[in-house]
């Protein structure tokens, strides 16, 4: 007991904020930066661990390649992407209210869930304010002339900026299955917001006048996510606001989809491919799923072994371990052996380390190179155990066994087959 009383426990309340400030200072001095992000040819120096913790998209890119240079092309301006990445260090984001939708779309592409939630909440708030202002315009004029308190309240609301905060005490929503009653409430909310959008005269939501000035700025304070969620491995789930019914994936699905599709259609020429990412090895990962957000965003990861689907890749990977499967983060293909996954990833990255000394052709696997060398040497090492045929390639033997003998290469011989082979 005496030994336990001698232990002193220190809790540093501002440790996280102080560390982020110091890392941002080091980033500005270009010290210890291990990655360069190119957003529409605009360079952003940063640290992989910080960017991966705040953006699921960036984390997946870092897992796919060890390159120090990652290139991203977005339909929004490069400044939008730069501010989003900078918010990973500062915990705050200044957004002009008329540009909320631009940041919402870009943050959705970068999978910065906490920013998407706050932008969605702010956007829905201003839509509600605009609708109420239209319906009660005459009544408001009468109240302003008769009630000085209401007039002062309106004057206070006409400010240049608004501060929206995510408190550290906000709980982390780790229940990805929305209850039926919550889903019904959410559906009615989304339908009301959609109908309000249709009533507006402007065809594009990002330029619609919803009752604020062009120079007004909305400041989003993004505090650190609760440590309880981090300990449980839930990196992608945001801190929920007081409006618990605003569930991220469904809300984003309803508010972003039509705008993303219209913006992709507006891009002229050969830019209609949408959003994509490029690494230094020259491999591209097209993101055409953004154009089809309405069809598959709610359950982007479908298990190949069971009917379960998942929104976040962390939960999907954890589930695949139960089936003893390995996932390729680039194309979503699964493998039963890790070595096959590594070989598959080398194909994505264009790495072909095995070269034929005769014709200089390169391959991703040593076994493939060996089969290729059989062409030059004339060897036919793969023997059929059912007949006298032999083959240069293992794949040709498998095809022969399946099509001719109706069996797989690993299937054991029956007794008559063994007797026939012994006679031969």
UniProtKB/Swiss-Prot annotation:
Q: Which GO terms describe its biological process?
A: negative regulation of transcription by RNA polymerase II; regulation of cytokine production; regulation of immune system process
How is this protein annotated for GO cellular component?
A: mitochondrion; nucleoplasm; nucleus
- Which compartment or compartments is the protein found in? Nucleus
Name-wise, this protein is: Zinc finger and BTB domain-containing protein 6
Keyword annotations for this protein?
DNA-binding, Metal-binding, Nucleus, Phosphoprotein, Repeat, Transcription, Transcription regulation, Zinc, Zinc-finger
Query: What biological function has been recorded for the protein in this entry?
Result: May be involved in transcriptional regulation.
Residues of the region (Disordered) are 402-424
- An example of a Pfam family matching this protein is zf-C2H2
Q: Which CDD domains match?
A: BTB_POZ_ZBTB6
